[in-house]
């Protein structure tokens, strides 16, 4: 703080640049991370990148029944939803602490 209670703008700028760099690094790490979702007790598994891209699907042959395709479809949707939930948790874990760091800049409303 400068005299008169005003924040030191150069220090604020340096801190903002540091937080921005950390945020970019965390976003890159998140995009490159992989999470796994599953349904049916692991009979259907999905691998998803942190960006949301599905990069793999594994289906146990036990759930492949030509007369009951609907169940398999439901399991695939469930596994994708589980993987998406894992991405959300990962994003919160990686990016959440950085959002908290913005409050320390000494700016009103942050």
UniProtKB/Swiss-Prot annotation:
Localization terms from the record: Cytoplasm, Nucleoid
One Gene Ontology term of the molecular function aspect: DNA binding
UniProt keyword DNA-binding present: yes
GO CC aspect terms: bacterial nucleoid; cytosol
Keywords recorded for this protein, A-Z: Cytoplasm, DNA-binding
DNA repair recorded as keyword: no
Main location class: cytoplasm
Gene3D superfamilies listed in its UniProt record: Nucleoid-associated protein YbaB-like domain
Subunit structure: Homodimer.
HAMAP family: DNA_YbaB_EbfC
Family: Belongs to the YbaB/EbfC family.
Function (record text): Binds to DNA and alters its conformation. May be involved in regulation of gene expression, nucleoid organization and DNA protection.
The protein's name: Nucleoid-associated protein Mflv_1287
UniProt lineage: Bacteria, Bacillati, Actinomycetota, Actinomycetes, Mycobacteriales
């Amino acid at each position: 703080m400068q005299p008169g209670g005003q924040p030191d703008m150069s220090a604020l700028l340096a801190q903002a640049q540091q937080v921005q760099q950390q945020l970019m690094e965390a976003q890159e790490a998140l995009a490159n991370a992989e999470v796994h979702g599953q349904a049916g007790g692991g009979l259907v598994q999905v691998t998803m990148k942190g960006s949301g891209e599905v990069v793999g699907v594994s289906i146990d042959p036990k759930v492949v029944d030509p007369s009951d395709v609907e169940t398999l479809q439901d399991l695939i949707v469930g596994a994708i939803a589980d993987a998406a939930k894992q991405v959300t948790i990962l994003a919160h874990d990686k990016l959440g602490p950085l959002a908290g760091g913005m409050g320390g800049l000494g700016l009103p409303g942050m």
